[in-house]
Amino acid sequence: NIVENALEQVRPIVAKSYRDYRNYKQDFVRMLDDVYKKSQAIMYVGDKENSNADSALVSTKRSLIFNQLNKELYQKFFLTTEEIQACRDGYIYIHDMSARRDTMNCCLFDVAHVLSGGFEMGNIWYNEPKTLDVAFDVIGDIVLSAASQQYGGFTVPSVDLILEPYAEKSYRRALAKYERLGVAADLAEKEALADVKKEFEQGFQGWEYKFNTVASSRGDYPFITVTAGTGTGQFARMASVAMLEVRRGGQGKTGHKKPVLFPKIVFLYDENLHGPGKPLEDVFEAGVACS
């Protein structure tokens, strides 16, 4: 290179700056070329690196192309030369490299606090749910929206305890309806409880459909987990058992039903609650049957 040699003889410092700038531009050309090649593969072949992302969807294709650019930028500006070489040689692997630049990884989301008193999301004010079925719908909206702002797992802890107060509201509403209709007290209570149980079953079924068919704005299906099993109240127990029974029954055509992927269910076992003769032994048995 004539210019580089001339600068080296006159001003070595300037020559070094010239080389660095030239290499910088060449690196960007290579980086964008790699992104373009990957984008062509995504558009016409697809990408199966992440089973949560269906590359047949247009929104997912866009997300995957953006992720490839993010990955290249992360390698360029956040990794050392030694780290990059170690990745290429297979000595280390950096998971979710495409998402590490601009957000957080994994979340234990406090849905109960968000619901309490209402909240704002997407410039719209959500009032606190007054019934169980509305609580299921609102929680589904919250989870998909919040999970889109991060990567990795998204966990909603103790859904049995979260849903318990809304089940109580639905129960009192149903009970009041039957009492207005002149139904006997014992029958009214029985029918109100049956209504709440049905709302639980439909709500958990709705989550299973929503979390496995509605992609997040990231273009993937968020890795959603829920925990349950420790609530000792009547409706908390009903929530845990209903969720496990819905999962056990599966989704799909009659005679061909199978369990869905999301949400993952984590049963919180406590020997003092779930052991033989303990108050939640029946909930534990439902968990065993589901597993």
Predicted regions and their residues:
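Non-catalytic terminal accessory/regulatory regions of metabolic enzymes
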Residues: 1-32
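Conserved catalytic cores of very large enzyme subunits
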Residues: 20, 24-291
